């Protein structure tokens, strides 16, 4: 992903805390979070793959959301866990740039897959008669391609400018992962261009999906209020409320971290904020989308009954 930097061949990740008494409790806490994330997302991927009645556009995007959450949790959490049990959590320069690239690829992809899911719900609720035509397999694949293209473009933009920087001899990165802002703090050269890229690219990666989602849900809310059936209105609200919770957690914590002036957000507070979109959201997404979802519950019962009779 990147050649070694002549000034700094490696970094030391500070981790989440420097208090020895908190390290082991935090290790087991985040190990538990990671296991729940893995089981939840792999379970949802398996359920969607094995049950044909879930092979719809909504679950096509949910399948990819779970895949993204699984992947970027795997990019971040294992290295974070190492920081709790080792004196120095060392990561090579190339390893750091690789982690940065894949973290950004998956996190940007998630922001756009959430907007694709909002559009899917808009079509399903506001134009149900045109749903199968509008959300055809070809359209779904094009939307998914757009999601991953935006993820690649965002990750490449940040990483390409990051590898051009010269880093200071102080190798300590005040974070539990290689993220943009803590790495910029370690640069001995001007970071003006990088900060401009952060402002533009993050603005697009948060702004465009957020506007898309808000417009979609404003139209959905307007349509729901016109539904005469109480049961139909309740079902529509139930379907959308879970998505709104996930979106609020993800974009709220991301915007708080990246779009606030660094002078107003000390890095230690930034680490806590980043826990929401790196650890908490990937863990909660399978629960949010499945606990109140009748289709997923039916699929789980069918899968368990098949396995018990096999």
Swiss-Prot record:
The keyword Cytoplasm does not apply. It comes from the Eukaryota. The keyword Transmembrane helix applies. GO terms for biological process: G protein-coupled receptor signaling pathway; sensory perception of smell. Gene3D superfamilies: Rhodopsin 7-helix transmembrane proteins. It is found in: Cell membrane. Glycans are attached at residue 5. Residues 49-55, 120-140, 217-238, 292-310 are cytoplasmic. Odorant receptor. This is Olfactory receptor 8B8. It comes from Mus musculus (Mouse). The lineage of its organism: Eukaryota, Metazoa, Chordata, Craniata, Vertebrata.
